[in-house]
Regions:
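Divalent metal-binding segments
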Residues: 2-8, 13, 17-276, 291-347, ...
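In a subset of proteins, long, contiguous C-terminal domains/tails are tracked
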Residues: 3-4, 8-10, 334, 387, ...
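Substrate-binding cleft/loops of secretory-pathway carbohydrate-active enzymes
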Residues: 268-285, 393
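Short helix-capping segments at alpha-helix termini
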Residues: 250-255, 284-285, 358-366
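Residue-level recognition of conserved beta-strand edge/terminus positions
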Residues: 112, 143, 395, 502-505, ...
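His/Asp/Glu-enriched, well-ordered alpha-helical/loop segment
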Residues: 329-339, 343-369, 373-374, 379-383, ...
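Short conserved micro-motifs at the rims of enzyme active sites and ligand-binding pockets
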Residues: 270, 302-306, 383, 404, ...
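Short, function-defining helix-loop hinge/capping sites that tune catalysis or transport
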Residues: 75-77, 160-162, 349, 403, ...
Length: 612
């Protein structure tokens, strides 16, 4: 047998405990056929074999996000300006102004998730007046975690919010002394006001949604992600909003493997939704690139406990158990796996009561099910999860909300939030993920950094000793495979498994902790095919697809901020008046000139600010 692809001269970390290290792999028909030495892989070389010298790069199994809103995120990716990783608010506001200047009527500028104020040098959020100055005429919507959204005056007008607009249930339209909306929307604690407002913005046409999803997958491939479990999401209707991803699958253009769960959209009609789906959708229908994965993360709306740590923990309504039980009972009867969003231990206790009651009547008997999030779950409830054969999918929400959690509950409580080590010690399946794109970043390296370092994106230490790098990697690969019932099929670099790997820009196992969050892939392989390549390997990868529309934020800001990005020569980095020149700070920040270009005339003197 001749291999289709051989990768050699690498430092492979296989996540296979029986064969943890290798220098080469051979791949045939999309699966590993040899994992070992260069000589062992080269023995399968034929005349048509592609051979790639990895030049000593660290290579890992392709990362697998156990909770990513990829389908919804893909439809909107080309509409959204990314503030993920941006080092200062001054930079972020300048990016916002630049995009507002490029955005045609009636489109909005949207900053949706992946950032918080603690990442900025200024350690604060933008003010509403700053948004109005940056974009006086273009509608701007800035989403901040699950707790609030900022709208400029133009966005308030097109959204139709006036002094006569009532507050929706669970939300607040903040008003000034005269009763006029200020532009601040607050979840108290329900985030529906934020998402329903976002949904008022224009959508991309189908052709552009296809392009948008391809751009998002390319960005995920750049970060070494090769698989994801899509958790559904609000305003993500089945089957309408799955048209794009199904077309890409049909055209063999998926570069990320997707297992998708179905998320109910109709309060008080959840059971009807699931009865319709279990009768029309075959469990696990699809293939290794796109397959159905069961129900959730929303099973009933009364069981949703949004994790807004700026607000007190919400008590779920007394009707929750009566509404959740028939849905779970139906899913167990139909042998449909399910997942359920649950942040707080108090919620989890009540949900487990329902699960145990159903299990007494209709045994789960190995049916895959799991909680998503579980930040404050107790050891007792971890044991109950294990007894029912469940798992826990954890995400890095504390990396973005840790400061708020500590402020409300204290540093001691944050030390084991979520209690990943206890979950592992109890033998509960654990998979890692991000919960991107509306709150956390989709960057898996931000998540891996948080798991290893115990720090937030703002640098706050939540716990002194994080997970080992090996354990963190296992959770983001082999661990996540359990949550789509694909354990043994992917997650390891092992003979017989799907050939998904990422060669990294730096050695994850030896770089300084702070450098982890800047790692990316230089060569990403899915099913034995190169889907992304950069640096020394760039010529081996497919060409990038032009971004549509041409005014999309992705044209100038192609994803997560990068320390070596050309954007650095365009943004203004200082956060206070220049001590030398005492220039007009806002004028400099809001200018379209490259005010921090150290190769320019003023930059040669150490500061371009003097131009202002």
């Amino acid at each position: 047998m001749n291999a289709d692809l051989i990768l050699f001269n690498g430092q492979f970390h296989t996540v296979d405990r029986e064969n943890p290290r290798a220098s080469a792999v051979a791949i045939s028909n999309g699966r590993f056929v040899a994992v070992g030495t260069d000589a062992e892989a080269m023995a399968l070389r034929g005349s048509g074999t592609q051979v790639i010298d990895l030049k000593g790069r660290c290579v890992i199994p392709g990362l697998n996000d156990s909770h990513l809103h990829l389908i919804r995120g893909g439809l909107n990716y080309n509409l959204e300006l990314r503030w993920e990783g941006v080092p200062s608010l001054a930079d972020a506001l300048r990016m916002l102004k630049d995009q507002a200047d490029r955005t045609p009527t009636p489109q909005w500028v949207r900053v949706v998730g992946g950032w918080n104020e603690f990442q900025f040098a200024e350690k604060r959020m933008p003010t509403l007046e700053e948004l109005n100055q940056a974009a006086p005429d273009t509608p701007v919507f800035v989403l901040h975690l699950y707790d609030r959204a900022l709208l400029n005056r133009a966005a308030l007008r097109v959204a139709g919010y006036t002094r006569n607009t009532p507050n929706p249930p669970g939300g607040e339209i903040v008003r000034d002394a005269n009763g006029e909306p200020t532009g601040m929307l607050v979840a108290r604690p329900n985030a529906m006001i934020l998402y329903s407002t976002l949904a008022k913005g224009p959508k991309l046409p189908l052709e552009y949604q296809v392009n948008s999803t391809r751009q998002f997958m390319r960005e995920l491939n750049r970060l070494g992600l090769t698989s994801a479990i899509d958790a559904g999401g609000g305003f993500q209707n089945y089957p309408d909003d799955y048209q794009v991803i199904e077309q890409l699958a049909k055209d063999q253009q998926l570069t990320v493997r997707i297992a998708y769960n179905l998320f109910t959209q109709k309060p008080k009609e959840e059971l009807t939704d699931f009865k319709n789906w279990t009768s029309s959708v075959t469990l696990h229908q699809g293939d290794d690139y796109l397959r159905h994965n069961g129900a959730g993360e929303m099973l009933v709306f009364s069981a949703a406990d949004f994790e807004d740590f700026l607000e007190p923990r919400p008590d779920l309504p007394q009707t929750m158990e009566d509404e959740l039980e028939p849905v779970v009972r139906h899913l167990v009867e139909q042998r449909w796996p399910f997942r359920l969003h649950a942040t707080y231990n108090e919620s989890i206790s009540r949900m487990l009561d329902v699960f145990e009651k159903v299990n007494r009547d209709i045994p789960f008997n190995g049916l895959p099910w799991f909680f998503d999030h579980a930040e404050t779950i107790t050891p007792q409830n971890i044991e109950r999860v294990r007894a029912l054969g469940g798992g826990i999918a954890i995400q890095d929400r504390m990396a973005f909300q840790g400061e708020y959690f500590v402020e409300r509950y204290g540093a001691k409580a944050a030390e084991a939030t979520p209690p990943i080590k206890r979950m592992l010690a109890e033998g509960v399946p654990v998979g890692a993920g991000t919960d991107a794109t509306r709150v956390s970043s989709y960057n898996p390296w931000t998540s891996l950094y948080w798991m290893v370092s115990g720090r937030t994106v703002g640098g706050l230490e939540l716990h002194a000793e994080g997970l080992s790098r090996q354990t963190a990697l296992e959770l983001f690969t082999h661990g996540s495979a359990w949550f789509s019932s694909e354990q043994g099929k992917k997650g390891m670099i092992k003979v017989g498994q799907l050939a998904d790997v990422a060669a990294l820009s730096a050695d994850f196992f030896s770089v300084d902790e702070e450098a982890i969050k800047w790692i990316e892939s230089v060569l990403t392989v899915v099913g034995g095919k190169v889907v992304y390549a950069a640096g020394d390997f760039e010529k081996l990868g497919p060409a990038s697809v032009p971004v549509l529309p041409d005014w999309s934020p992705v044209v100038k800001v192609p994803g997560h901020w990068r320390p070596t990005s050309p954007m650095q020569t365009q943004v203004h980095h200082c956060s206070g008046p220049c001590g030398v020149h005492s220039h007009s700070h806002d004028k400099a920040r809001l200018s379209n000139a490259p005010v921090s270009d150290f190769a320019g005339f003023w930059g040669a003197f150490g500061c371009s600010c003097f131009a202002f």
